[in-house]
Amino acid sequence: MDEQEAVFMIERIYVKDISFESPNAPLSFVQTEAPTVDVGLNTASTVVEGMEGLTEVTLTVTVKAKAGESTYFAVEVQQSGLFRVQNIPEEHMPALLAVHCPTILFPYAREVVADLVGRGGFQPLHLHPVNFEALYQQAQTQQQNYTTQ
C-alpha cells in the first residue's frame, strides 16, 4: 500500500456505555396516555493516543419517553467505533468524523435502543434514519452565523 494512499477503515464497532431506566414501572405499562418521545444525538471524536492512525468516534443517542410528568423510560446509548484514518486531507476530516462515521454507527445504536426498550417491557422503539449530512450543514451554518454576529 502506498504511504500516501488515503485510508479509511472500520477497525471495530462497540457499545461503550448503556443506560436504561423505567422509573415508573410497572405503572407506566398501564398508562393510557401516549408518551412523547424526545431523541437527542451527539457525536464526539478523539485520536487514540499510542495507536497511530486510529480515531475513536462515539455517537450518543438519548431517548426519553414521557407523558406529562411521568417518565415511561429513558435510554442512553454510546455507540463507538475505532476508525483507521490516514492520509486524509485535513479539510475533509470534520465531515468524515461528523457525517460518515456517525452514519456507520447509527444503525448499531438504533438496534441497541430498540432492544433495550423492548426488554424494558415496552414496544420496541425503531428510530427513524438520520441525515447526518444535513445536521452537519445546519451546525456549520449556525457556527458561521454565530461568528459573524
Curated annotation (Swiss-Prot):
Gene3D superfamilies, per database record: SecB-like
GO BP terms: protein tetramerization; protein transport
Taxonomy, superkingdom: Bacteria
A molecular function (GO) term: unfolded protein binding
GO cellular component, one term: cytoplasm
Chief localization: cytoplasm
A Pfam family: SecB
Record keywords, A-Z: Chaperone, Cytoplasm, Protein transport, Translocation, Transport
InterPro entries: SecB, SecB-like_sf
PANTHER family linked to this entry: PROTEIN-EXPORT PROTEIN SECB, PTHR36918
Assigned protein family: Belongs to the SecB family.
Name of protein: Protein-export protein SecB
Organism of this sequence: Acidithiobacillus ferrooxidans (strain ATCC 23270 / DSM 14882 / CIP 104768 / NCIMB 8455)
